[in-house]
Amino acid sequence: MITIRNVSYRIGTRPILDNVSLDIPEGGITALVGPNGAGKSTLFSFMARLRPLESGSIAYRGKNLACTPTAELARTLSILTQENSIMSRITVRDLLMFGRYPYHQGRPSENDKTIVEEALAEFHLQDFSDRYLTELSGGQRQRAMIAMVFCQSTDYVLLDEPLNNLDMYHARSLMQILQKLTREHKRTTVAVLHDINQAAAYADHVVAMKNGKVAMQGKPDDIFTAANIKTLFDMDVSVLDHQSKKLIVHHI
């Protein structure tokens, strides 16, 4: 379980996060949703220890994030941010092997190579595994980055807007892969998602934020109602049942 207690953050006098406390359940996909400026990515940055907490605490299975040694954290938590600074002159296969670095420390084993090859297959990257990142489309590069994160083999995976640069087909395909791997490997995946239909279809748990606070949380079927979406986004929608999932239809 990820335990977040009394986390606040301000820029000047403006609250970005306002005393956020929540428990993210162990296992499955938890989607962080909400309008722009709700505080989702800021909360993500604290959960990923990309910036130091100003107040409150975050713990993974009871272990305080702030006190966890970096080497241990790299084998516990893997992250993908919106902005990634991985060098471009690297092949897809080498990028995925870079995700194994916390284990091989520059000397890849046969097990590391096997994990990389399996990830290339799972994320449909074999056809350009030896191409440089500069030679890939934005969507292909995004899939490669997420595959690298999963190669890290951590119990916790944090993804900030993983569907960036992906068309409808590849966004759905990626969410199906994430759901499959999360379940098979018994991982806990937390993803910031702007597409609430993807969250409704693939998340096991939803945390909805607004104005720096947790507005509501629970199962997708309980969160994605017309009334709740009106509260979150201040817009009218219809919520349909489609193939046992909620489908949110915007009024145009």
For the regions a protein language model found, what residue spans apply to each?
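Conserved structural motif at the start of ABC-family nucleotide-binding domains
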Residues: 2-4, 17-19
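The feature captures the beta-strand-to-loop junction immediately N-terminal to the Walker
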Residues: 33-35
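Helix-to-loop junction immediately C-terminal to a conserved catalytic motif
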Residues: 48
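Conserved ABC ATPase signature
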Residues: 132-136, 140
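Conserved ABC transporter NBD signature motif
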Residues: 56-64, 73
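Conserved ABC ATPase "signature" region
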Residues: 97, 110-128, 153, 158
